[in-house]
Curated annotation (Swiss-Prot):
Monomer. GO terms for cellular component: cytoplasm. SUPFAM superfamilies: P-loop containing nucleoside triphosphate hydrolases. It is an enzyme of class 2 (transferase). Pathway: Purine metabolism; AMP biosynthesis via salvage pathway; AMP from ADP: step 1/1. GO terms for biological process: AMP salvage. CDD domains: ADK (cd01428). Consists of three domains, a large central CORE domain and two small peripheral domains, NMPbind and LID, which undergo movements during catalysis. The LID domain closes over the site of phosphoryl transfer upon ATP binding. Assembling and dissambling the active center during each catalytic cycle provides an effective means to prevent ATP hydrolysis. Some bacteria have evolved a zinc-coordinating structure that stabilizes the LID domain. This is Adenylate kinase. It catalyses: AMP + ATP = 2 ADP. Pfam families: ADK, ADK_lid.
Amino acid sequence: MRIILMGPPGAGKGTQAEKLSKELDVPHIATGDIFRKAVSEGTELGKEAKSYMDAGQLVPDDVVIGIVEERLKKPDCHEGFILDGFPRTVTQAEALDKVLSDNPLTAAVYIDVSKDELIDRLSGRRICRKCGKSYHIKFNPPQVRGVCDEDEGELYQRDDDNEETAKERLEVYLENTQPLVEYYQDRGILKKIDGTKSPEEVFRDILKAVQAKQ
């Protein structure tokens, strides 16, 4: 099963991707992680990406697509994958379709959450400075305020999670992603999921939607 998971910041993509990966026994591929791995391992594409990043420039599509393609060709992806964070543009989506021409995507899942709810979720998020574990002051608070349950690390709010920045991030995301949503809608593989339900209900809805596409 080859699935793309889409949704704005704060929609819970990471949580759902991990759950789906376990349930379907396919890898969760977060593009940020494979980028960092390619750079740290010093692969040809990783070196190329690093040269752009060091210069403060956007990494060109052909390099991004190359890094994703390298990962999708690994043996653990033969039975499928959950792709999180890619594609971000229609150009990237078209290139991905070419890469997957023999085994096309099963579904593109979009976790839909209202703007107000997303701002509430993002601005309440707190991260552990030591281990990076994520909490929420309202939905998933730590046992002791401001302290991580795992390692007693200090919890902090990321700069891009304050309310004003969260609003800006959402505007940019929604504007850039709309053409991608339409692209997968036109291809007949888009599945919109109500992301305002509990994580367990969202997971069940995603599972039902992707299994119906098999």
